[in-house]
Amino acid sequence: MSKYSNLLFSALLALLTTSCYHEVDLDDFKNNEGKNLLTLNSLICPDSVIAVSATRPYFFSDKHNERTYIKGLNILLSINGQECETLTYNESRHLYLSTIKPKQGDIVKVSTVFNDKLVEAYDTIPYRVSLLDLDVKRRGPLAIYTVRDFVFTYSITFDDPTNETNYYFLQWNEVDAQRDVMMGERDFTHELVFQALANDIHETLPGWKPYCAYGLPFSDRGINGQRHTLVLEETVQADRYSGGWRKPEMKRNFKLYAISKQYYQYLVSVLVNQTDDRGLQGGMIDLGIADPIKIYSNISGGIGIWAGYTISQKTINVFDSVGEIPRQ
């Protein structure tokens, strides 16, 4: 997301990300050369120091007890073209850590040498996009899965920045599993941006529907530069055999991640190539490329993902807006 007066950095970033961004088919790496590749993974945001995982690639078909972490690397961190520091390895976390936090709009680069080969990656941390409004309505009881289901329709409004292409990831969940109504089935299918995502994925995976229990990525195609309201639904089963709805609250936390183009393409590649939700769980990334599938990497000289993001979030108690789910 370009907001820089220094056009040289923007031009350099475009050149570098184009040159090092590539599709990886791990079938090609299942040999000695592949086993000697360095896998770098990191998600970078302004809310924390930079943490980098450095491992060897592994395959689920091979015998392995744990990941093979690579120690002793000199990983140099640069921000906006200025060398900042050499990351420090943390033994207990198996991560290389910085002492500084990057800022929104920073171009962040890491570089190291592994087996006499230069390995490096670049990305830009997007600017935060705020959630402006969050509204909810309830319908039901309806006969969908049981004779007593309730559909909650969420309307989430934000302003998409103008004059640039932007990428996002939307996620929502219960806040407290002990007190909140159990999370129902998410429905992304009525929303324009996820319909556009499905159309893109249909080129590779015909029939795919926009669903994932951990949320989904989307771009601003069709809404560029506009104030847009996302429309999402959640179906909660509330028949006498379902106990998850008998809770005192129904708090829901919504997170809108502004993500880089590299991160978006990585997440889409995971959706296309994995048959379950593993790749999008746990903070939107399954660290370490594993199964021999085609997946995208923006690590020059190695494989993995180096990607920036920011978060905006809002929490509501649904019952405050629409009342409690009626008792039978």
Q: How does the language model describe each region?
A:
Residues F9-L13:
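Hydrophobic helical h-region of N-terminal Sec-dependent signal peptides
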Residues Y21-Q328:
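A sequence/structural signal for flexible, mid-protein segments enriched
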Residues M1-L8:
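Bacterial N-terminal signal peptides that target proteins for export
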Residues L16-S19:
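C-terminal motif of bacterial Sec signal peptides marking the signal peptidase cleavage site
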